[in-house]
Amino acid sequence: MLSTGSNSPEAAVLPGKPEVGLPLWLLAELTYRCPLQCPYCSNPLDFAEQGKELSTEQWIKVFREAREMGAAQLGFSGGEPLVRQDLAELIGEARKLGFYTNLITSGIGLTEQKISDFKKAGLDHIQISFQASDEQVNNLLAGSKKAFAQKLEMARAVKAHGYPMVLNFVTHRHNIDKIDRIIELCIALEADFVELATCQFYGWAQLNRVGLLPTKEQLVRAERITNEYRARLEAQGHLCKLIFVTPDYYEERPKACMNGWGSIFLTVTPDGTALPCHGARQMPVQFPNVRDHSMQHIWYDSFGFNRFRGYDWMPEPCRSCDEKEKDFGGCRCQAFMLTGDASNADPVCSKSPHHGMILQAREESETATHTIEQLAFRNERNSRLIAKG
């Protein structure tokens, strides 16, 4: 039986509340609508069945309450946030409140005029994502024949408007062997920051894990090449910064996910559900909604946000582990996805009794034969089919 510990009588009583910090980082998932179909999207599988999006006024109320509580950084995400017609207005209101604002976008739907409007509204930062350095592979993964050309044009336009060029490439077994070409493209575009983020397995990426997880050999090679480029760029005095993010499937200790559950990070989904991380929606927990509760109540008093705070909730082997203050027991969403119980130790940890699942995934990556065309693409049709079971 799947469990987060939230549906049993024993779980109704929480341990004493640990000290709670401020929700410094607010992620506003403005919409699940998106013109692309990336098979590694972190959105929930049943996104097509989610409720009505928050209105402009409701989002502004969220921003105001979060800012009053100490939130400092606000990310606009999705889906594709550009499909919201009120995006410039939301950026402007966030600016008035004093947020540092970041637009996380595919670049599809972006125009020179919108960049100008966002600049006037006070947007601080734009990150554009690519699927690959090769036009054919990029467009195949995105599910759009025009995606690559649009991304190139908008990356240059963002820089021309005075923004630093920040690019994100999600890497996986189908594009990681071209890491050198990806970096060369970024250099040619005069990128300032490049995130080479190996696929993290949540949402659609978890559904497609066997077809996306790189082999260890692929990862080692990609990281070596990235380090070689770093050294070369530094020697040349080049300002481009390369950030290489590995999947924890090849680690022996889990990541300190979100710096701890309900520690500094707060996500609000398109329908107003508030989450301690953007992957938590899959858990069978009744998370609070901003339509019904204040941000103050959600952050400090709601069951969902307090469930895995601190250390008292931990079973063994986490409870007695001398590393628990470093990794907080790892990722609760990953523990739930793989074991059915979010209170279990993250299976990535070699101390977890479920670590064999990770070892099996590594073995499967060595023999996987999935093509890009065989992946389940993130679109409304597939989402509705999944929701129906």
Swiss-Prot record:
Binds 1 [4Fe-4S] cluster. The cluster is coordinated with 3 cysteines and an exchangeable S-adenosyl-L-methionine. GO terms for biological process: pyrroloquinoline quinone biosynthetic process. Its cofactor is [4Fe-4S] cluster. Its EC number is 1.21.98.4. It comes from the Bacteria. Keywords: 4Fe-4S, Iron, Iron-sulfur, Metal-binding, Oxidoreductase, PQQ biosynthesis, S-adenosyl-L-methionine. Pathway: Cofactor biosynthesis; pyrroloquinoline quinone biosynthesis. [4Fe-4S] cluster binds at C34, C38, C41. The keyword Oxidoreductase applies. It is an enzyme of class 1 (oxidoreductase). SUPFAM superfamilies: Radical SAM enzymes. Catalyzes the cross-linking of a glutamate residue and a tyrosine residue in the PqqA protein as part of the biosynthesis of pyrroloquinoline quinone (PQQ). Interacts with PqqD. The interaction is necessary for activity of PqqE. NCBIfam families: PQQ_syn_pqqE, rSAM_more_4Fe4S. Belongs to the radical SAM superfamily. PqqE family. HAMAP family: PqqE. This is PqqA peptide cyclase.
